[in-house]
C-alpha cells in the first residue's frame, strides 16, 4: 500500500457535515485495510481567491496508507459531492505523522494568549 496526503475543502455552509464526511472516508480506508496516520480538521479558513463566489472554506487534511482502489473511490466521491469545493490527493514516499505547520502555529499562539491574559490581570491589581 502507498502513502497519500489528502486535503479537501468543504463549502462553509456545510461545515456541520464535515465530521460525518471524515467518519465515512476514514471508515472506508480502514475497511480496505488502510491506516490513518494523521487527521487534522483545520476548520473554516479564508481562501486566497474566491471559488464559486465563496471567500471561506472548511479545510481537512488526512495522511493515509491505503490501496489504490480506495483512493479511486475517494476521488469519485469528492468529484460528485457538491459540498467539496476542491481536493488534492498526493502520493508521498513515507507516512507523515507529525503535526502540520498549521497546527503547530495554532498551538504556539495559544500559550501566548494565556500569558497575555495573566499579565493583564496582574496590571489591574
Curated annotation (Swiss-Prot):
Molecular function GO terms recorded: small ribosomal subunit rRNA binding; structural constituent of ribosome
Keyword Signal listed: no
Region of interest: Disordered: 100-125
Keywords of the record: Ribonucleoprotein, Ribosomal protein, RNA-binding, rRNA-binding
Segments of skewed composition (Acidic residues): 116-125
Keyword Ribonucleoprotein found: yes
PROSITE patterns found in the cross-reference section: RIBOSOMAL_S6
SUPFAM superfamilies found in the cross-reference section: Ribosomal protein S6 (SSF54995)
GO terms classed as biological process: translation
GO cellular component: cytosolic small ribosomal subunit
Compositional bias ranges of the Basic and acidic residues kind: 104-113
InterPro entries: Ribosomal_bS6, Ribosomal_bS6_CS, Ribosomal_bS6_sf, Ribosomal_S6_plastid/chlpt, Transl_elong_EF1B/ribsomal_bS6
Annotated family: Belongs to the bacterial ribosomal protein bS6 family.
NCBIfam families on file: S6
Protein task: Binds together with bS18 to 16S ribosomal RNA.
Name of this chain's protein: Small ribosomal subunit protein bS6
Source species of the chain: Histophilus somni (strain 129Pt) (Haemophilus somnus)
Taxonomic placement: Bacteria, Pseudomonadati, Pseudomonadota, Gammaproteobacteria, Pasteurellales
